[in-house]
Amino acid sequence: MNYLAGGSTVNPTEQGLNIPVDMAFAFHSDAGTTLNDSIIGTLGIYYTNVYNEEYANGASRYLAHDMTDLIQSNIVRDIRSLYEPDWTRRGMWNQSYYEARVPRVPTMLLELLSHQNFADMRYGLDPRFRFTVSRAIYK
């Protein structure tokens, strides 16, 4: 990621391919089960406490917080309105995961659902659900 953006306006301090990448996004499923097989839901992860809380272009790393909040809100709202009114928004973590810490552009890790939990996976295997989530991320 940093090599792609290196030399561009978003990462001017590193050498690279000079591609001004606006953001990095890691799409994951999480592990975990519940005793009653209820929805585990969606978690957003970002990280601010590195590089003096700034990206390479001087922008605040709190942009990742705002981006994570917007994307997670879109996803959960669309899932609740179209599929499951009780879909869980698990919160947002400001944690030092590699994928959130290293990129020099705003970054989000999305843990959409639990791949070990039937209540989550009955949606996760539905192509319409996948499209809805993808659209929610994009908009």
Model-predicted regions and their roles:
Residues 1-6, 29, 72-81, 138:
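Sec-exported extracytoplasmic/periplasmic mature domains
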Residues 1-40:
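Catalytic-core regions of hydrolytic enzymes
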Residues 29-53, 83-139:
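Active-site-adjacent mobile loop/cap segments within catalytic or ligand-binding domains
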Residues 56-57:
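Short histidine-centered catalytic/ligand-binding loop motif
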Residues 60-93:
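Active-site-adjacent substrate-binding region
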